[in-house]
């Protein structure tokens, strides 16, 4: 391309007859951008066709959706308060609470005096009630079968068992079958044998017994008031074939005694000086049971048998 053609492209105005290279340089410097752009136009089109598609940016694989909050959520988020832990001392308060208790006023001495008098009355009433308690002063005869059988064969009559429930004495008597006509009575006293009463026993049909013996039962109501100084004793009489056989517990009789409470809560027989009578013969010391003594066990639980002598037990018939 000649200098003249170059100047015509850059500036379409008419040229002089002679064009020098300096004129071309001046025209290039002073020319406007549109002619240059038109001159470089083919190169821009070539670049767009070959490079733009190759350098196209990749699409992101992350699909992020921006969901606008609803108006209600926006209100709740502003109204909801954040939870915080605040200590009392940071608010100027004390970490401890102090309660002051004043001493109770002392009760006057006269109140205590009346309380002691009331306690004395209660103790007296309790003692009076205790003196009315009664227990059997003998073990159940049938618990020692060998002794019971020997006594029965010798005397023809023997107390089999006895119980004391409230104010009633009940029990059974075993007699030897020596005749068809029989009469069995309980002779009992409540005033140390100054007076006594004979109570008839009732025949009981033998279900498991043999033909050599019969069984009778009795029930005796005790008086409502029995002085502690009086003896309560009974024995058994058996009338058959014009003869009278007795069971008086080997001369000691069967006794019912008054009891008192010990500090450990156990009932025991009242001392002789308290009951105003003494015993004519010494008592044999008996084995102790979990209830304190065999006599006590018979009084508290008369329907229970004591098995303190297992070596003497045998089948009863």
From Swiss-Prot:
Quaternary structure (record): Interacts with PPP1CC catalytic subunit of PP1 and associates with glycogen. Forms complexes with glycogen phosphorylase, glycogen synthase and phosphorylase kinase which is necessary for its regulation of PP1 activity. Also interacts with EPM2A/laforin.
Residue numbers covered by motif PP1-binding motif:
84-87
Q: Which organism does this record belong to?
A: Homo sapiens (Human)
Disulfide bridges in this chain: none
The family database entries (Pfam families) matched by this protein are listed as: CBM_21 (PF03370)
Q: Name the chain's protein.
A: Protein phosphatase 1 regulatory subunit 3C
GO MF terms listed in the record are: glycogen binding; molecular adaptor activity; protein phosphatase 1 binding; protein phosphatase binding; protein serine/threonine phosphatase activity
Q: Where is this region: Interaction with EPM2A?
A: 141-263
Going by the entry's taxonomy, the superkingdom of the source organism is recorded as: Eukaryota
Task: Report the GO terms under cellular component.
Answer: cytosol; protein phosphatase type 1 complex
Q: Which biological process, per GO, is one annotated for this protein?
A: regulation of glycogen biosynthetic process
Impact after mutating residue 249 to S: Found in a patient with progressive myoclonic epilepsy type 2 also carrying two mutations in EPM2B
Q: Which UniProt keywords apply?
A: Carbohydrate metabolism, Glycogen metabolism, Ubl conjugation
Domain comment from the record reads as follows: The N-terminal region is required for binding to PP1, the central region is required for binding to glycogen and the C-terminal region is required for binding to glycogen phosphorylase, glycogen synthase and phosphorylase kinase.
Post-translational modifications reported in the UniProt record: Ubiquitinated by NHLRC1/malin in a EPM2A/laforin-dependent manner.
Q: What lineage does UniProt assign to this protein's organism?
A: Eukaryota, Metazoa, Chordata, Craniata, Vertebrata
Start and end residues of each CBM21 domain: 149-257
What this protein is reported to do is described as: Acts as a glycogen-targeting subunit for PP1 and regulates its activity. Activates glycogen synthase, reduces glycogen phosphorylase activity and limits glycogen breakdown. Dramatically increases basal and insulin-stimulated glycogen synthesis upon overexpression in a variety of cell types.
């Amino acid at each position: 391309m000649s200098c003249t053609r170059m100047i015509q492209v850059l500036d379409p105005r008419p040229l002089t007859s002679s064009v020098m290279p300096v004129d071309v340089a001046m025209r290039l410097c002073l020319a406007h951008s549109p002619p240059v752009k038109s001159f470089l136009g083919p190169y821009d089109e070539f670049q767009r066709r070959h490079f733009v598609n190759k350098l196209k940016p990749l699409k992101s694989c992350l699909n992020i959706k921006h969901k606008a909050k609803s108006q209600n959520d926006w209100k709740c988020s502003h109204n909801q308060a954040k939870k915080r832990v605040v200590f009392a001392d940071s608010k100027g308060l004390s970490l401890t609470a102090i309660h002051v208790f004043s001493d109770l006023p002392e009760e006057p001495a006269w109140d205590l005096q009346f309380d002691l008098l009331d306690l004395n009355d209660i103790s007296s009433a309790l003692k009076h009630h205790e003196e009315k308690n009664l227990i059997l002063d003998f073990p159940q005869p049938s618990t020692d079968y060998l002794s019971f059988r020997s006594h029965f064969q010798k005397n023809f009559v023997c107390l089999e068992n006895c119980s004391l429930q409230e104010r009633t004495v009940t029990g059974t008597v075993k007699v030897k079958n020596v005749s068809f006509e029989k009469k069995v009575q309980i002779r009992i006293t409540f005033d140390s044998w100054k007076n006594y009463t004979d109570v008839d026993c009732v025949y009981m049909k033998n279900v498991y017994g043999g033909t050599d013996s019969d069984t009778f039962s009795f029930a005796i109501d005790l008086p409502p008031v029995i002085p502690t100084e009086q003896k309560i004793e009974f024995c058994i009489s058996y009338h058959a074939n014009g003869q009278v056989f007795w069971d008086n517990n080997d001369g000691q009789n069967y006794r019912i005694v008054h009891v008192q409470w010990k500090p450990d809560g156990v009932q025991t027989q009242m001392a002789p000086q308290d009951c105003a009578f003494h015993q004519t013969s010494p008592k044999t010391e008996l084995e102790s049971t979990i209830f304190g003594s065999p006599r006590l066990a018979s009084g508290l639980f008369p329907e229970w048998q004591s098995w303190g002598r297992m070596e003497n037990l045998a089948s009863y018939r």
